[in-house]
Amino acid sequence: MLPDLPIQQKYADVYKALVANQKSYERGLEDLKHSIDALLDKIKHTARMKSVGDLFADVDSRNEGGEISDVRGINITKRFMPTVADTNGVNLNTYKIVKKGQFAYSGMQTGRDECIRIALYDEEEPIIISPAYSVFEVKDKTIIPEYIMVWFLRAESDRRGWFMSDSSIRTNLDLVRFYEMKVPTPDMKLQKSIAEMYASYVTRGNISETLKKQLKDICPILIKGSLEEGLKHA
């Protein structure tokens, strides 16, 4: 039995308020993303361009003692993830170590996936990755790692990587070609602002997703509450 209209309206208003709150976060998220994209588009025409090879230094530190067992890979969203490869019986001593503030890169299948697989590691405890990956750290002290990561998160960077990938079946973006890619290098203050804006964008995105989940979870509760209140007034 449905509750009276005033009770229905009461619970509908609660739901509408929650939806409006989530939508406001979503709109703010879109506005912030547009601001970041516009700023990056501007600096690529005004800031000095440097090649990736001038910004990165190769790091080859191996898990020789076997102390680290946390094996990761990189997904197409440019984030570290637990490896999907079967490591049973694999000698992890040859795997490369990645520490906080370092990048991992794989040039494989860049063209096929239309994605440059690069990720910045931001956790305290080091991890290991396949020897097939490359590990970098920023050697140019005027460049902030987080800013470079934001640059490579752009769809335009992925399209450029696809264009520069080779003609093999796997359409790889080998290191030589990757090192030739250009990155605009504004002053550090602007780099920091861009990195902070993107961090805020990620935080707001997480909040928006949490609110969406809460909306799903609260619907049965609101319906139950309205029915119970309706019975009390029956």
Predicted features along the sequence, with ranges:
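Structured loop/turn residues at beta-strand edges in well-structured enzyme cores
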Residues: K50, K99, V176
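Sequence-specific dsDNA recognition surfaces
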Residues: G53-F103
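Short clusters of hydrophobic/aromatic residues that line enzyme substrate/ligand-binding pockets
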Residues: R72, I118, G161, L173
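A short beta-sheet element
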Residues: K100, A104-L153
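Short, positively charged
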Residues: E146-S168, D174
